[in-house]
């Protein structure tokens, strides 16, 4: 288990390393018809599915058979440009040219995919890498990319980026002069001009670089891409990003503000002011990492604490500016987020996201991986290619190599719910202070979530009109219904489950489906908390708010016993102190103490003397997740 924070107090129940990090942070036509009918009454269609490391041919078919009929608004594809060779997924994030021949398919296949997705009513978002090229630790000397483009990762020569205007491509002169790895995130210049995990850092202020990169975006646009997810934007100055976008918009004759722009910026209040997420909304929307932290925190604690989430997150990013997710490919593989391995809690968190009224929701279609193999590429990947996947076959069971989240019964139902309720406000919030919550979306929809281990008899108030509604979380054929009478819902909510109702799916009038549930639905019959973890250690990461601290230590208690020696913390290359503690299977409370200055810190109070632990806190504050997680050499880190 890993805890990372720049805040100093937390309490966690030790549940093992394979749990998540606590942070201070067969498809039948009738099934498709169900989703399509829901989409026809949609007030909104903005759900995004991240089709991670899937080929263009695979995505094209899934657009036609699943995403379009379900009412998905966008599918996000992995970086389409040529990259370094390697089986690992992160090789896609080390470009060697902007040729559209990659491990995931050819330019012709890419164009065909876009046409097929568009015909199904699904727009394509491209994951775009503009910050860096290759890492010197994995791409030394003369090498070739997956499409054969030559480059030299030692000298910084990349002729594959050549254009008519710049026939020599990219040379060392087109990168920032700083050749050291980023270590101090309080220094904006270092973050934006030095190297992220040894990767050559484009001089984004350079007009030549801006021209080459804007030409790449034009090429994507002309092929039909209608959204751009900009990778590692924190490492690019806002003015430089604005200049690239403006060059791009002028070349295609569009208003820059009308181009859908998603920027990956991981916020951390302890870092430089100029790299905070709010600075980037001038150029487009921003990924809100705080949302996934809250999901991870409270679905492992008390979901009732999600009350007021919109207001909390809106202090940093307005809902219209935020893209939210329960997990993405990075966070899933680096702890700090719920994943499919968390079973029903993961499903419930995604249902909450699709039911709630904050941000634009992003789902993840991903393959499964074993612990310790987080860098592994898609099943069957070679150093230069990824095989096509027959999702109808892979998703005909729940034990294949792929995690078919996009086809789960709950996902289908909640996308329809989300589209139907549109911008209706959250009303009628109710909770029991613990594992059960419920709320309406005005008179459009209602959801109740039971995150507990026992079935719950509930009586909730709802703004839905009286009637018999399909429970779209549980079934696709309306074989399970819930009645609203007198503005009340009286029912039983199964353990680790939910009920979801919306005005467009009633017993009297509902979409047709031949099957109650999808065969890809995960098996969540085992209540996860009943399994005792074998790893009872916890690793705590901490960055002191006070720069005068030189020898921070962890002062901690196990259970009610605070007679433990203080744990020494060691400084890592990214500026975080860390300590690993054996919890002996007990809850752990901790504060931080600097031995030199004899100062103490916790997140609840400003303290210069030893503070009293706040025992009511059960996990780390969600807003204090750090910007980076230490990564093996050569991989693209969460940054």
Where are these regions (language model features)?
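Hydrophobic core
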Residues: 17-27
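Active-site-proximal helices and loops of the catalytic beta/alpha 8
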Residues: 38-49, 56, 62-68, 72-73, ...
């Amino acid at each position: 288990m890993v805890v990372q924070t720049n805040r100093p107090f937390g309490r966690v129940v030790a549940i093992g390393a394979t749990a998540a990090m606590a942070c201070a942070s067969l498809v039948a036509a009738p099934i498709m018809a169900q989703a399509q009918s829901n989409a026809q009454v949609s007030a909104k269609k903005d759900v995004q599915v991240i089709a991670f490391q899937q080929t263009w041919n695979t995505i094209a078919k899934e657009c036609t058979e699943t995403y379009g009929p379900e009412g998905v608004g966008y599918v996000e594809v992995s970086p389409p440009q040529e990259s370094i060779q390697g089986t690992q997924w992160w090789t896609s994030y080390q470009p060697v040219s902007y040729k559209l021949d990659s491990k995931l398919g050819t330019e012709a296949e890419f164009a065909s995919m876009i046409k097929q997705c568009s015909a199904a009513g699904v727009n394509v978002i491209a994951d775009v890498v503009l910050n860096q090229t290759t890492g010197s630790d994995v791409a030394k000397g003369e090498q070739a990319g997956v499409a054969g483009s030559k480059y030299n990762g030692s000298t910084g020569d990349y002729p594959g980026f050549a254009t008519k205007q710049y026939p020599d491509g990219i040379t060392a002169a087109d990168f920032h002069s700083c050749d050291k790895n980023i270590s101090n995130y309080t220094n904006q210049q270092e973050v934006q001009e030095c190297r992220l995990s040894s990767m050559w850092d484009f001089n984004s202020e350079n007009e030549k670089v801006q021209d080459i990169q804007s030409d790449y975006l034009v090429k994507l646009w002309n092929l039909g891409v209608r959204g751009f997810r900009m990778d590692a934007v924190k490492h690019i100055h806002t003015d430089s990003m604005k200049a690239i976008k403006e060059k791009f918009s002028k070349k295609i004759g569009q208003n820059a503000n009308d181009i859908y722009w998603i920027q990956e910026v991981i916020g951390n209040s302890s870092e430089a002011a100029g790299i905070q997420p709010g600075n980037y909304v001038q150029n487009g929307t921003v990924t809100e990492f705080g949302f996934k932290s809250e999901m991870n925190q409270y679905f492992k604690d008390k979901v009732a604490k999600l009350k007021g989430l919109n207001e909390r997150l809106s202090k940093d990013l307005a809902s219209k500016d935020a893209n939210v997710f329960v997990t993405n490919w990075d966070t899933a593989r680096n702890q700090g987020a719920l994943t499919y391995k968390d079973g029903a809690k993961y499903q419930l968190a995604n249902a909450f996201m699709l039911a709630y009224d904050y941000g634009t929701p992003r789902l993840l279609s991903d393959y499964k991986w074993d612990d310790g193999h987080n860098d592994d590429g898609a099943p069957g990947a070679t150093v230069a290619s990824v095989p096509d996947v027959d999702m109808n076959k892979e998703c005909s069971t729940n034990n294949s190599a792929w995690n078919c989240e996009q086809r789960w019964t709950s996902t289908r139902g909640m996308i329809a719910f989300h589209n139907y309720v549109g911008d209706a406000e959250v009303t009628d919030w109710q909770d029991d202070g613990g594992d059960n919550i419920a709320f309406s979306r005005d008179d459009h929809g209602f959801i109740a979530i039971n995150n507990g281990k026992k079935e719950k008899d509930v009586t909730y108030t709802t703004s839905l009109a009286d009637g018999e509604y399909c429970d779209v979380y549980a079934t696709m054929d309306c074989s399970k219904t819930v009645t609203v009478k007198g503005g009340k819902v009286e029912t039983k909510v199964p353990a680790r489950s939910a009920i979801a109702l919306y005005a467009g799916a009633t017993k009297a009038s509902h979409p047709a489906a031949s099957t109650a549930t999808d065969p890809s639905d995960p098996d969540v019959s085992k209540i996860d908390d009943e399994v005792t973890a074998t790893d009872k250690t916890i690793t705590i990461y901490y960055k002191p708010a006070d720069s005068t601290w030189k020898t921070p230590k962890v002062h901690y208690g196990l259970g009610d016993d605070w007679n433990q020696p203080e744990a020494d913390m060691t400084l890592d290359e990214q500026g975080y102190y860390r300590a690993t503690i054996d919890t002996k299977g007990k809850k752990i409370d901790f504060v931080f103490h600097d031995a030199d200055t004899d100062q103490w810190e916790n997140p609840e109070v400003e303290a210069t003397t030893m503070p009293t632990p706040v025992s009511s806190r059960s996990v780390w504050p969600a807003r204090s997740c750090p910007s980076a997680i230490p990564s093996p050499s050569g991989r693209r880190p969460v940054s």
